[in-house]
Amino acid sequence: PINYILLSLGVIIGYFFGVLMAPKLSLSPDSITTQGVVVFLMVFAVLLLDFIIRKNNVTKNNNFVILLFVLFVLLVPQVYNAPKLILANIFVLLATRRILSLTTEKNTIKKIFDATMYITLASFCYGWTILFFVVLYPAIINKTKFNITYVFIPIVGFLGITSIAVAYQFVVTDSY
């Protein structure tokens, strides 16, 4: 418990370094709310990473991975000025959680679709995260009893989520 408090404190300290390095600082209520959400999302990302590690026995009984994550965030505190990047990070962590859970044979199609959905949503926030589809296919081949329909689920999921996003853009902004 104390290590989570210290790591959360590290995230908050990194936030203050990121805000101090920002070229312009506004103290409007909207800006303060946005920055509070950013700090909450970063703490949530740390706790989500810890959950993924503990649930899938990635490391034994230590917190070095989340310590390294917090230290990397402290190395680049400008990440706090990019809320879309933090949101994409959370979506990638959620996709990683679903990919690692493919070892159990329950609801394999749902897990593959969920991972596809999270990667697609992350790519809407930050375009380069679409490359995580490269990780999804070897996981499908190696971690499941291979079925050819599993290969087409990410394609159908990506096209479905993208078509919903495009339809939303047409309705809301009247343009693509």
For each feature predicted by the language model, list its residue ranges.
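Membrane-lumen/periplasm interface segments of specific transmembrane helices
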Residues: 153-176
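Membrane-interface alpha helices of multi-pass inner-membrane proteins
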Residues: 111-125
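Membrane-interface transmembrane helices that cradle and orient dolichyl/undecaprenyl
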Residues: 95-110
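Transmembrane-helix motifs of polytopic, lipid-linked glycan transferases
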Residues: 40-56
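N-terminal membrane topogenic signal
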Residues: 1-11, 59
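Perimembrane helix-loop-helix junctions
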Residues: 132-156
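Transmembrane-helix signature of polytopic, membrane-embedded enzymes
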Residues: 53-72
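Aromatic- and kink-enriched transmembrane "portal" helix at the membrane-lumen/periplasm boundary
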Residues: 31, 68-86
